[in-house]
């Protein structure tokens, strides 16, 4: 059954959101192929993307960024730590806070991951002109830089 979002009666913002979601969903196979190639779970990929080498992050902050609870992140980090990709230590000012950092091996794998995910432009975006790609990038940056309501 058609809905307002498929018949053109949705607001421009709702239609844009639906199209962004559709674009992301169209790349799921690519994401899973990279996960398989690098022997990482999708959750490990998301975590590794968010951990920048040399910039330790509190495990609770990573949990918030991933939209899950600390116990889920503990399992994700356990597996990354077992592979020598991240380190975990107590916080300098509060020993209850667990800080995460990327190891040199993790930084190398992270670089491979980012290259495989982002160096090749997906076909739907490659079809846009350079000016359209720039406009889309600028609009998305503006949307993401805006404070949440």
Can you name each region flagged by the protein language model?
Residues 19, 46-52, 108, 135:
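Pre-recognition alpha-helix immediately N-terminal to the DNA-recognition helix
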Residues 12-15, 43, 105, 132:
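N-terminal positioning helix adjacent to the helix-turn-helix/winged-helix DNA-binding module
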Residues 21-24, 49-53, 114, 141:
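Short, locally clustered residues in the helix-turn-helix/winged-helix DNA-binding domain
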Residues 1-38:
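N-terminal leader segment of winged-helix/HTH proteins
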Residues 1-11, 131-149:
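C-terminal regulatory/oligomerization modules of transcriptional regulators
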Residues 28-29, 78-141:
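Charged, amphipathic alpha-helical coiled-coil/dimerization segments
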Residues 29-69, 83, 99:
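N-terminal helix-turn-helix DNA-binding core of bacterial DNA-binding proteins
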């Amino acid at each position: 059954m058609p809905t307002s979002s498929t018949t053109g009666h949705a607001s421009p913002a709702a239609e844009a959101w639906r199209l962004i979601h559709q674009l992301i969903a169209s790349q799921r196979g690519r994401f899973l192929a990279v996960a398989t190639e690098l022997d990482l779970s999708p959750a490990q990929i998301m975590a590794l993307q968010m951990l920048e080498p040399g910039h330790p992050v509190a495990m609770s902050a990573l949990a918030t960024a991933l939209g899950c609870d600390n116990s889920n992140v503990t399992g994700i980090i356990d597996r990354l730590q077992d592979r020598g990709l991240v380190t975990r230590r107590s916080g300098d000012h509060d020993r209850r806070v667990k800080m995460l950092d990327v190891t040199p091996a993790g930084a190398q794998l992270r670089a491979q991951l980012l290259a495989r995910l982002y160096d090749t432009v997906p076909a739907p975006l490659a079809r846009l002109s350079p000016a359209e790609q720039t406009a889309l990038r600028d609009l998305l940056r503006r949307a993401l830089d805006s404070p949440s309501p």
